[in-house]
């Protein structure tokens, strides 16, 4: 800080010295104010030749000559008339006097460094960082840890990127050899297979094809008793039992063989996961429950319909009542207006018994 203060005081003294030097005096114009009397009295004067303006190089040389004679620095004006001329003069002066130019260059560099340092300090203060002397040891340690963590992550990211690049290069270098067997397999496989379930892009089957597949699935020419149409299932079961009874009367052995065959077929269906409904008692109970639920829904629907009709009737009655009230109020207003105007109405005569 002491060095900074010394530099600051030095710069301020230098600026004061430069500002205190007198500027170049303006030359007084020798031109006088002409009047009519002077023109008449005096002899005709010769026209002065226009003096050519000196070039910036000549002016600089003249100034250097004067300063060498007087042993002083050339005076600098605070506001140069032409910025381009002043730049040229500065360049010529720097070329003309190497010692002065070296001194001024050093001073300017020193001043720029000092100002730059002050600017950085102000920026740090504005960011809330400030000088590290005022911070505690814990804060400094935390900053150091954060910096190390950032560097570690950066190194890790670079390593990962390098590994990815190496792997990509290896993949590009190693071409995949496609054997004819693999190509044939890819052509033959028309769909995907997920856990022994073949999923192929086929068109939806027609109605006749579906019926054919259903007949093929039937085992032993015995249609399984499945579904939720309990009445139909009960009728089919009763018909099957009736055929068995008739066959038992004719040939008991044949009937027994058919019954065993039906049982085995039902067992095969159950093994495949098909729910067989071949119990007459359970079918009757399920049918009763279904009929009961249907009756309940029917009653609810009828009740709801009645309620809707009642609501509609109530709205209609209320509307008619409101219309009658409005009509009566309108007639009453008309009567009141007539009474105000002094008219005698038939109703008034009836009330008075004069009609």
From Swiss-Prot:
Motif (Nuclear localization signal): 45-49, 152-156
Claim: RNA-binding is one of the keywords in the record: yes
Biased composition (Basic residues): 44-53, 143-160, 208-218, 290-302
Region (Disordered): 18-104, 123-178, 198-227, 290-355
Modified how: Citrullinated by PADI4.
Residue numbers carrying Phosphoserine: 136
Biased composition (Polar residues): 94-104
GO terms, molecular function: DNA binding; molecular condensate scaffold activity; RNA binding
Predominant location category: nucleus
GO terms classed as biological process: ribosome assembly; ribosome biogenesis
Keywords for the protein's UniProt record, in alphabetical order: Citrullination, DNA-binding, Nucleus, Phosphoprotein, RNA-binding
A GO cellular component entry from the record: nucleolus
InterPro entries noted in UniProt: Rrp14/SURF6_C, SURF6
Signal peptide interval: none
Origin superkingdom: Eukaryota
UniProt modified residues of type Citrulline: 106
One Pfam family named in its UniProt record: SURF6
Protein family: Belongs to the SURF6 family.
Protein name: Surfeit locus protein 6
Organism in which the protein naturally occurs: Mus musculus (Mouse)
Source organism phylogeny: Eukaryota, Metazoa, Chordata, Craniata, Vertebrata
Name of the coding gene: Surf6
């Amino acid at each position: 800080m002491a060095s900074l203060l010394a530099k600051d005081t030095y710069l301020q003294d230098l600026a004061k010295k430069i500002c205190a030097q007198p500027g170049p005096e303006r030359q007084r114009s020798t031109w006088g104010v002409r009047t009519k009397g002077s023109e008449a009295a005096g002899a005709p004067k010769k026209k002065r030749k226009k003096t050519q303006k000196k070039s910036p190089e000549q002016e600089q040389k003249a100034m250097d000559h004067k300063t060498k004679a007087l042993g002083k620095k050339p005076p600098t004006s605070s506001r140069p008339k032409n910025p381009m001329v002043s730049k040229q003069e500065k360049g010529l002066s720097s070329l003309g006097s190497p010692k002065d130019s070296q001194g001024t260059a050093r001073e300017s560099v020193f001043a720029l460094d000092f100002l730059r340092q002050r600017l950085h300090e102000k920026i740090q203060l504005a960011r809330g960082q400030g000088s590290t002397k005022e911070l505690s040891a814990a804060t400094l340690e935390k900053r150091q840890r954060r910096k190390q963590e950032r560097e570690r992550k950066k190194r890790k990211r670079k390593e990962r990127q390098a590994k990815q690049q190496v792997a990509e290069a290896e993949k590009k270098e190693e071409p995949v050899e496609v054997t004819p067997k693999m190509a044939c397999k890819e052509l033959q496989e028309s769909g995907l297979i997920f856990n022994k379930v073949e999923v192929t892009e086929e068109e939806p089957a027609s109605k006749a094809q579906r019926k054919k597949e259903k007949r093929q699935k039937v085992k032993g020419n015995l249609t399984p008793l499945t579904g939720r149409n309990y009445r139909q299932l009960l009728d089919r079961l009763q018909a099957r039992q009736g055929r068995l009874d008739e066959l038992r009367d004719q040939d008991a052995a044949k009937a027994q063989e058919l019954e065993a065959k039906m049982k085995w077929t039902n067992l095969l269906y159950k093994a495949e996961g098909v729910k067989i409904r071949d119990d007459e008692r359970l079918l009757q109970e399920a049918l009763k429950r279904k009929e009961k639920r249907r009756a309940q829904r029917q009653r609810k629907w009828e009740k709801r319909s009645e309620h809707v009709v009642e609501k509609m009737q109530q709205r209609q009655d209320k509307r008619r009542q409101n219309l009658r009230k409005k009509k009566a109020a309108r007639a009453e207003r008309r009567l009141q207006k007539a009474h105000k105007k002094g008219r005698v109405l038939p109703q008034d005569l009836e009330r008075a018994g004069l009609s």
